[in-house]
């Protein structure tokens, strides 16, 4: 995989910043607008299993996203079914997170390969956080987008690959934002055509990512593994 000097410089800068701030998430997505086709998705899963990556079981999850970049996550089929029926977080276990771009230029697009490196800042929020409490008070009228996710995760040395089949709220045509709704059923998420998404995420606090140089090698190695599966080739083209 050939990169320009500027692309290499920017990726190096991402890794340097990621290495000194554990709130930062550095990941890579694949395909046009972050989506691959189902055959490519299966090719990637098969390669990761063949190469001995550790498969990590995942429960189905529902991400509920608000316009102010707060994401609620429910996990487990039973809880998801309950939410679909009652549209409330009352008496349900959930996690919450504030997630946004780390800085204005937080995407690096490698158009020749349909790859995007992206940096995001994450902040876990407790149920008692004032921002969460305010949202819960007016939950019935809050604008929301929904992502119903079935995920297969594979972990390697300092890296995790997430392969996700996603049904989600559609975007406004010609824009990058969701068609917000106040209830799950309002946008018929269950009837949406699934999207197939593949992400490579660099993991903090591992012996393979504890210096910027090691983290960069780990990231490029993981991206290369996915690219080989996409290209159906043992050598990167």
What function would you assign to each model-found segment?
Residues 1-237:
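Phosphate-end processing signature that detects enzymes handling 5′-triphosphorylated RNA
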């Amino acid at each position: 995989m050939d990169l320009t000097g500027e692309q290499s410089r920017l990726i190096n800068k991402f890794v340097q910043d990621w290495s000194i701030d554990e709130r930062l998430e550095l990941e890579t997505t694949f395909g046009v607008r972050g989506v691959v086709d189902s055959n490519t998705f299966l090719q990637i899963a098969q390669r990761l299993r063949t190469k001995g990556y550790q498969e990590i079981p995942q429960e189905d999850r529902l991400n509920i996203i608000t316009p102010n970049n707060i994401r609620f996550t429910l996990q487990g089929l039973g809880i998801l079914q309950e939410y679909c029926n009652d549209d409330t977080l009352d008496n349900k276990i959930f996690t919450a997170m504030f997630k946004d771009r780390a800085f204005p230029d937080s995407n690096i697009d490698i158009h020749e390969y349909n790859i995007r490196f992206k940096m995001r800042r994450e902040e876990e929020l407790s149920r008692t956080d004032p921002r969460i409490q305010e949202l819960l008070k007016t939950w019935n009228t809050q604008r929301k987008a929904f992502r119903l996710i079935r995920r297969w995760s594979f972990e390697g040395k300092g890296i995790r690959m997430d392969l996700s089949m996603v049904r989600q709220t559609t975007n406004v045509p010609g824009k990058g934002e969701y068609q917000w709704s106040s209830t799950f059923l309002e946008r018929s998420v269950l009837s949406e055509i699934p999207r197939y998404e593949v992400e490579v995420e660099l993991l903090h606090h591992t012996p393979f990512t504890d210096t910027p140089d090691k983290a960069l090698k780990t990231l490029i190695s993981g991206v290369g593994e996915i690219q080989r599966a996409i290209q159906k080739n043992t050598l990167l083209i």
